[in-house]
Regions:
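Conserved AdoMet
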Residues: 2-121
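Conserved class I S-adenosyl-L-methionine
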Residues: 115-128, 151-153
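Extended basic-aromatic, gly/pro-enriched interface segments that bind polyanionic ligands
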Residues: 123, 144, 148-229, 233-241, ...
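A short glycine-rich, Lys/Arg-flanked "PGG" loop and its adjoining helix->strand segment in the class I
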Residues: 243-255
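Conserved beta-strand signature within the Rossmann-like core of class I S-adenosyl-L-methionine
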Residues: 255-263
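Core SAM-dependent methyltransferase catalytic element
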Residues: 270-308
C-alpha cells in the first residue's frame, strides 16, 4: 500500500524512472558484470525491468529501483543486472565456430583418451540453446566415432533465462530458429498444455546441467574443463572486464584443453598460456610446457656456495 501511495504521489507512470537512475543502472551493470550499457538503452531498461518489477511484487518499476538503491539488496541487484543483460540466443547459431567444435575439438578430445567423459563449459549460457546445441553435436559425434558423451555445464547469472535453460522447454518459434527438423524430432518432445512447446528429451538432458554463477568471479569451484565455449559476448565486456573474464576461463581449461570463441572474436594480447590452432583467432589450445630434463652427468658449476 505504501509503495502504491508513493507512486501515486509522484504522479508518474508505472514504468517511468528518474533520469539519474538510468546512469546509476548503467554503472551498476558495469560494476557487477563488466558490461557497459549504451546511453540509448533507456527503452531496454524500462521494458525488461518492468517485467521483473511485476515478478518481484513491486507496484511499479520506479518503486523497485527506489528500493534497489535505497537498501543495496545484493539479490535484487543481481536479478536486475542479469535481466538487463539477457541475450537473444538460438540453436545452432554461428555455424562456423560449431564446425570447429565438431570437427576439431571433439575428435582431439577423443584421441586424447582422457579415461573419463570430457567436460565442456558453456560460459554465459543465457537461456541454454548453446549448451543443448553442443550436446546434440556431441551426441552425433559419439554415434559416429564411439566413446562417451561429454559432460556439459552451462553457467550464467541467476535469471529467468537460466531457469528456462534448466527446464529445457522452448516455444515453437524458438525451436524453429536454427534447429533442424531432424534434431528437433530426435531430441525434443511436445510439451505445454496444447503441445505447441518443445521439451528436451531425457536422453539429451542426462549429460547437461546448468548453474548460477557470477561470471566475473573465480571459476575454480566448477573444476577443470577440457573445452570452454565462450562465443559472441566477449566484445560486450569493458577492457578490464575482458582481462578478468579471460583469466577466469583460461584458469579452468585443463592440459591440452581448448578455448572456443565466436567467429570474429579474438583474445586481446594473445597469451594466457594458449596458442592459436591452425592460425584461427577464435580457437585456442593450452600450451603444454615440457619439463626440462636434468643432465645428471654434467659437472656441477663451481661457485663459492657450491662444492669445492
Amino acid at each position: 500500500m505504501a509503495r502504491a501511495a508513493a507512486t501515486a504521489e509522484r504522479g508518474a507512470s508505472p514504468h517511468s524512472l528518474k533520469r539519474e537512475y538510468y546512469d546509476a543502472l548503467r554503472q551498476l551493470t558495469l560494476e557487477l558484470a563488466g558490461i557497459q550499457l549504451g546511453r540509448d538503452h533507456a527503452f531496454l531498461i524500462e521494458t525488461r525491468l518492468a517485467s521483473l518489477a511485476r515478478a518481484e511484487g513491486f507496484p511499479s518499476l520506479a518503486d523497485m529501483v527506489d528500493e534497489l538503491f535505497a537498501t543495496g539488496q545484493n539479490r535484487l541487484a543481481v536479478r536486475v543486472v542479469s535481466t538487463l543483460l539477457e541475450r537473444d540466443t538460438r540453436f545452432f547459431s554461428d555455424m562456423r565456430s560449431l564446425q570447429l567444435f565438431a570437427g576439431v575439438v571433439l575428435p582431439a578430445l577423443r584421441r586424447a583418451d582422457l579415461g573419463r567423459p570430457a567436460r565442456i563449459l558453456s560460459f554465459g549460457c543465457a537461456s541454454g540453446q548453446e549448451a543443448w546445441t553442443l550436446a546434440m553435436i556431441a551426441r552425433q559425434s559419439v554415434a559416429k566415432l564411439g566413446g562417451e558423451p561429454p559432460e556439459i555445464v552451462g553457467v550464467d547469472y541467476p535469471s529467468a533465462a537460466l531457469e528456462r535453460a534448466r527446464a529445457g522447454v522452448y516455444t515453437h518459434f524458438e525451436a524453429q530458429r536454427g534447429l533442424p527438423i531432424r534434431q528437433l524430432l530426435a531430441n525434443f518432445e511436445p510439451a505445454g498444455p496444447d503441445g505447441t512447446d518443445w521439451r528436451v528429451r531425457d536422453a539429451l538432458r542426462r549429460n547437461v546441467r546448468f548453474e548460477d554463477f557470477h561470471l566475473l568471479s573465480r571459476l575454480d569451484p566448477l573444476g577443470q574443463f577440457d573445452c570452454v565455449v565462450f562465443r559472441g559476448s566477449l566484445r560486450r565486456y569493458s577492457g578490464p572486464a575482458q582481462v578478468r573474464v579471460l583469466r577466469g576461463v583460461t584458469q579452468v581449461v585443463g592440459e591440452n584443453g581448448f578455448l572456443l570463441l565466436g567467429t570474429g572474436d579474438a583474445v586481446p594480447h594473445v597469451g594466457y598460456g594458449f596458442e592459436e590452432v591452425d592460425g584461427l583467432s577464435n580457437l585456442l589450445r593450452r600450451r603444454v610446457v615440457k619439463p626440462v630434463e636434468a643432465d645428471t652427468e654434467a659437472e656441477p658449476k663451481r661457485t663459492r656456495f657450491g662444492p669445492g
